[in-house]
């Protein structure tokens, strides 16, 4: 931990983390808030559902491309400079989106927003590692977890309220003042805590990283809609896979790599990465499956579906500071192993949901699942990063955040693929093709997709048995 900022003044951790919390909350809120407005946007801009999905795909793609090179940016620019740049991009993107008269302009706004988020998240994690001692990092990461889990959870519900009374533009207008406040607060309190070393920039590594991570994220993001056999998906995953292979080979053979893969020599970091990867797959697949189930099988309106999922999301966020303090006191094993056990139980019962399952049952199961995941996510991530030496913090945070984006794309794509296959298999044996059969087939497909989540949770539980407090 650093006691002084690079300018010599004493570090004040609380105002620094408060700046990140404000900016991060709005950035992650806007990421999911727009999901509720997609059907409205199809009507407003007279576009297809495939086109409107680019608002999500484009956002994820930008994160997948920029987050891997964030480790380099953290070593080239000061903490204050990167913070102001990130929040400025978020403000600019939000303003462009709010004023958008066309879908193309809205798409540009979303990409600019994503640039801000891609810069902010790794900077936030890296700064916490630098300003908090190891025995307090769990609590600090817990506060960050509150934002990362809570903001996306309340996004759909708040946007549902906005859409009932105002137009979709107000999702962005309401976010704008809070981003400006975060920028002004940061101007006063943000301090430079990282050392600017300005390592050599390897252009080829950046190109390979962009093609590799961008290709993989795009392929999985497109697979759910276009199918795994489409030329777009196949070309993207082949190009992405080859580029990733070349990227890894180049990083291992360079004296000063863009992304230092020596982090994988630290077993608790690698294990933490695997556990976070699995957790994100479970979260993102659940976030795509349950709204489909609630709106189609239970015939709930979008706003009502958002309310059903709100308690679980809020609990997940509120649990993060609590699990952070428990991590500082008892280490990772006391949280991660029980967390996966809770997740396995919740997912087992989610595989058994039917057309007649009550909304209350879904609220309980979703809440239990979110509690389990909150016991895994931040403790596993913090424990893994704790094992790294300070010089590898930028690379560790970049890799951790990159794999989260990739796991989210993979989890969503696999869940949709399994669900679609389950629907098709059910309809092949169904008597007739009426509305009741369509609803029953969707429910059967969602059951199958939750089996995938259950298998991932069981794998996570087995892996968690090897976790130890990082030294």
Swiss-Prot record:
Entries under Pfam families matching the protein: MFS_1 (PF07690)
Q: Does the keyword Protein biosynthesis apply?
A: no
The UniProt entry lists membrane topology as: Multi-pass membrane protein
GO terms of molecular function = transmembrane transporter activity
In its UniProt record, which GO terms are filed under biological process? response to antibiotic
The alphabetical list of record keywords is:
Antibiotic resistance, Cell membrane, Membrane, Transmembrane, Transmembrane helix, Transport
Q: Does the keyword Plastid apply?
A: no
The portions of this protein that span the membrane are: 15-34, 55-77, 82-104, 111-131, 141-163, 170-187, 202-224, 231-253, 268-290, 297-319, 329-351, 358-380, 445-467
| Family per record | Belongs to the major facilitator superfamily. EmrB family.
> What does this protein do, in the record's words?
Proton-dependent transporter. May mediate the efflux of lincomycin.
PANTHER family (alphabetical): LINCOMYCIN RESISTANCE PROTEIN LMRB, MAJOR FACILITATOR SUPERFAMILY MULTIDRUG TRANSPORTER MFSC
The protein's name in its UniProt record: Lincomycin resistance protein LmrB
Q: Give the source species.
A: Listeria innocua serovar 6a (strain ATCC BAA-680 / CLIP 11262)
